[in-house]
Amino acid sequence: MKLEHDISVVHTTHPFVIARGGASDHRLIRVRIRDDDGVEGWGEAAPNRFYGETADTALAALARLAPIVEACDPWKLEEVETELNRALRFNGSVKSAISAALHDLIGKRLGVPVYRLWGLDPARAPLSSFTIAIAASDAELRERIAQAATYPVLKIKLGTDRDEQIIRTVRDAAPGKILRVDANAAWSPKHALRMIEVLVECGVEYVEQPVAAHDLDGMRFVRERSTLPVIADESCVVSTDIPRLVGVADGINIKLSKCGGLREALRMIAIARAHGMLVMAGCMIETSLGITAAAHFAPLLDYADFDGAALLADDPYRGATINGGAIAIPEGPGLGVTRR
């Protein structure tokens, strides 16, 4: 087999700003694994600096992992992910891209979509939220909410000195929508509790990562006093993080770019369920190639946030969609992703 890659720069329709900053352009890496007879599997890496990755470090990681991939038996999906993790502890986006490409390859070999490899029913996928990033003004915020009119579930990014004003504006502009909030680790525990009172008043469904990723005592403090479910995102990267989050958070947010592969994502779901926790999955800014890989396990989730490609002005792929919030998983073999 041969491991190849190419780099692309994609652009969001609006600057995607969260509590720790933002940008409009994003470098992504497409991974191609080509078997000896020409069958290809595709995957996508969306490196994120918060988790110690950039496009440059991702390329270096790919070079290091290439010998493992090119010598592997693609049918041994679990074994390959184990070998990748032994070779590199971090670089989750690169490992997840390789994992997705191998699943794509095997699905194409068998002529079935990846979700069928796992025995899943796509009709059981939850609605996806659509993210409203931090806007510069109330007028801009209302404009973005209007543009998201077809989405029944909105995820609101907070973590500013205007948070109460933002969430009240959103509720006023979208009185009938389900609202979820993501503070991206921006609040102190006590401020989180003050904000949760406002969120409850505004009918918010849950709050995601209210405090710093490392502050598990602070998150436990919030969770024990909160009337809203608390979901751990930045605090939950891989499956071994989950046991220490029991009693600290009500649920976890899985992202392929964090956890490093589809097998690991399935493992995280199983472990969280065993502990009675809620399970959601999210994304970085990704094209439909990256989003579709995660969408194949959407039927196992309580909540989904698969809007990464919907936020783009220039998505180069066709794959899973979230029209009206409903996740439509491709029926084609493998991931079912094609170029536009």
Where are these regions (language model features)?
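Active-site cofactor/co-catalyst pockets and adjacent glycine-rich loops in catalytic enzymes
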Residues: 309
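Short helix/strand-capping turn motifs
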Residues: 301-305
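Alpha-helix C-terminal capping segments
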Residues: 106-109, 296-300
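N-terminal capping/lid subdomain adjacent to the active-site entrance of alpha/beta enzymes
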Residues: 1-179, 184-193, 197-201, 225, ...
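Catalytic core of soluble alpha/beta enzymes
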Residues: 156, 161-291, 296-298, 313-325
